[in-house]
Amino acid sequence: FEADALAGERSLPLADIWPDRPPLSMSPIRLMKRPGRSIVEKLEAVRSMMADKGAQSVFFSALDDVAWMTNLRGSDVPCNPVFLAYLLVERDSAELFVNAERLSAEAARAIAGAGIATVSPSTLHEALAAAALRGA
């Protein structure tokens, strides 16, 4: 994996092949009522595994993984309690790439309280390139 590959020209190939794409969901994203483990506990477990493997970061792109890690639920996919988002966990930080306007007040507080920053999905490309340049 080369950081330079991410730093090249940005394109939006879906715009070319799916010009009539429907708008992204604005349905609310809510906090789970009774999760088995807290967000902080899950982040600690992931960071422990990262340290064991010598990893600088973990990028979660599977919607169910993002939902599980954050204890959040949505309704972007029929019959699945997931939402469109990505999660980048580094040793000292974490970023949730999601439209923050969709988070309920309770969900926003829980995410911030766990030390996860909410970041616009439009910045994902740059964030991954920066992480790669840092060796993450």
Q: Model regions: which residues?
A:
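Terminal domain-start leader segments
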Residues: F1-A136
